[in-house]
């Protein structure tokens, strides 16, 4: 069977940036990596209702800067910024360094693979039919401006005895094209029949930045043929 490489991992440094951007010596690398994992785990559990897509961590000058990408910034910030201050203190304690929290709003959650996958998973937990949830997500993404989307669910769909997977695709999803901007993410739905896995691929277009501009060569005009007999 053919296996698929992770769409985000293969594009790191080409069209996708890393979600942890810092440099450390050998002595500090392991502790920083573990600290990143602890911070992400804490924030994901704390902000389950905030529609968090990703958490980007930077470490400038013996401090930590966390950028939370969310579709509901008001839930993260809280009344008069009180919740952000609580998060900042907790992150600073976990990392052991001064912390700064930034909030980035996601304007189009229908085009974010993580948010789409979480939405489908939540609908499955509310006993919405999986085909309806998949089709609704695909239609919303294409309506907002996606060039292609694929959604796959796996598990005991509809309470069936035998687990299976079903997928639905619309538009193009070119996984082999490295310049293709493909957002990929997964989620899990915990139902009474077991865990159902959700995968989402969203193709937003091709990234051409950094490539040399293609200049079309002027077409050479062919000389006009003289009419016969002259």
Swiss-Prot record:
GO terms for molecular function: mRNA binding; rRNA binding; structural constituent of ribosome. Gene3D superfamilies: 3.30.300.20, Ribosomal protein S3, C-terminal domain (3.30.1140.32). InterPro entries: KH_dom, KH_dom-like_a/b, KH_dom_type_2, KH_sf_prok-type, Ribosomal_S3_C_sf, Ribosomal_uS3_bac-typ, Ribosomal_uS3_C, Ribosomal_uS3_CS. The keyword Disulfide bond does not apply. Pfam families: KH_2, Ribosomal_S3_C. GO terms for biological process: translation. Belongs to the universal ribosomal protein uS3 family. This is Small ribosomal subunit protein uS3. The lineage of its organism: Bacteria, Pseudomonadati, Pseudomonadota, Gammaproteobacteria, Alteromonadales. The gene is rpsC.
């Amino acid at each position: 069977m053919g296996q698929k490489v992770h769409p985000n991992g293969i594009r790191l440094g080409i069209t996708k940036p890393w979600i942890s951007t810092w440099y450390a010596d050998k002595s500090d690398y392991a502790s920083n990596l573990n600290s990143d994992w602890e911070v992400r785990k804490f924030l994901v559990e704390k902000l389950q209702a905030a529609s968090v897509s990703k958490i980007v961590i930077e470490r400038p000058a013996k401090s930590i800067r966390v950028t939370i990408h969310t579709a509901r910034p008001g839930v993260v910030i809280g009344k008069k910024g009180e919740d952000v201050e609580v998060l900042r203190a907790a992150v600073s304690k976990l990392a052991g360094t001064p912390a700064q929290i930034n909030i980035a709003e996601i304007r189009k959650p229908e085009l974010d693979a993580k948010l789409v996958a979480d939405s489908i998973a939540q609908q499955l937990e509310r006993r919405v039919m999986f085909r309806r949830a998949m089709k609704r997500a695909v239609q919303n993404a294409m309506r907002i401006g996606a060039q292609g989307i694929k959604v796959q669910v796996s598990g005991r769909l509809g309470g069936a005895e035998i687990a299976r997977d079903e997928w639905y695709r619309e538009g193009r999803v070119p996984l082999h094209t490295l310049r293709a901007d493909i957002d990929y993410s997964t989620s899990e739905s915990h139902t009474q029949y077991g865990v159902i896995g959700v995968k989402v691929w969203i193709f937003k277009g091709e990234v051409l930045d950094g490539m040399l501009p293609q200049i079309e060569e002027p077409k050479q005009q062919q000389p006009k043929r003289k009419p016969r007999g002259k």
